[in-house]
From Swiss-Prot:
This is Protein LicA homolog. Belongs to the peptidase S49 family. InterPro entries: Aminoglycoside_PTrfase, CcrZ_PhaseVar_Mediator, Kinase-like_dom_sf. The lineage of its organism: Bacteria, Bacillati, Mycoplasmatota, Mollicutes, Mycoplasmataceae. It comes from Mycoplasma capricolum subsp. capricolum (strain California kid / ATCC 27343 / NCTC 10154). SUPFAM superfamilies: Protein kinase-like (PK-like).
Length: 238
């Protein structure tokens, strides 16, 4: 039985019996990873086939998790396993993505003041990022599947080398992690720099605004993310 899956914004996906079929829709930044590299991670669904047009995974039945104290240890351990794997992922492309989104925003006339106001700060953050760690790069909770015994990380199409602080900040920000859970998460991860993490929290909210204002339809509501940038910049300067 073939059933279309509506979740996900780039590719066209279907469940076919016990498999997950994804028809690839390429942009300049996705599907660059060699998916075979992921085969040794027990938190990645089994890869069945992959070619230029489509990729097929084992279908995992489960739910999108709420990241909290009940599962943060398992999630952290998996992130550490990935970051310490020494796998050679594609070259980081965050700088190119930001440039592309900014130009697209001009074309769509969807810009807002905060994007220009903090452009120099963002460029400086990008210039100083480390690129030595293999990253998933899109660890929204909706790219996780929670089962009875495991949390799977899925949708690896944007995976590249990069700065571990980006991955940490990305999960904290996109999951709206509360302060107690964040402290446990960072204590468990342990090997991080709090200043670099703060810079990457600013960057994550910036790129989320860019994405919303270039990849979704108007009206745009990015006030929440704009305020988070302002709050984090205030912390940066205090």
């Amino acid at each position: 039985m073939k059933m279309k899956i509506t979740k996900g914004g780039t590719n066209v996906s279907y469940r076919i019996d016990n498999t997950f079929l994804q028809i690839k829709n390429y942009n300049s930044f996705n599907h660059q990873i060699n998916y075979e590299l992921l085969k040794d991670f027990d938190f990645v669904p089994k890869l069945i086939s992959n070619d230029q047009k489509e990729i097929v995974w084992e279908y995992v039945e489960g739910n999108e998790p709420v990241v909290d104290l009940n599962n943060i240890k398992a999630i952290t351990n998996q992130i550490k396993q990935l970051h310490n794997s020494n796998l050679n992922f594609p070259k980081n492309n965050l700088k190119q993505r930001v440039q592309y989104y900014r130009q697209k925003m001009v074309e769509l006339n969807s810009g807002i003041e905060i994007i220009d106001k903090y452009a120099n700060l963002i460029d400086d953050i990008l210039d100083k990022m480390d690129h030595s760690t293999p990253l998933h790069n899109d660890l929204f909770p909706f790219n996780m599947i929670e089962t009875k015994n495991k949390i799977y990380f899925v949708d690896w199409e944007y995976a590249t080398m990069g700065d571990k602080h980006f991955e940490l900040a990305y999960l904290i920000e996109t999951s709206n992690m509360n302060s107690e859970c964040e402290k446990v998460f960072l204590d468990l991860y342990s090997d991080y720099d709090s200043y670099k993490l703060l810079l990457n929290k600013i960057f994550v909210n910036y790129i989320v605004i860019l994405w919303i204002r270039t990849q979704t339809s108007a009206p745009y509501n990015t006030t929440f993310f704009e305020q988070k940038i302002i709050n984090y910049v205030t912390k940066l300067t205090n």
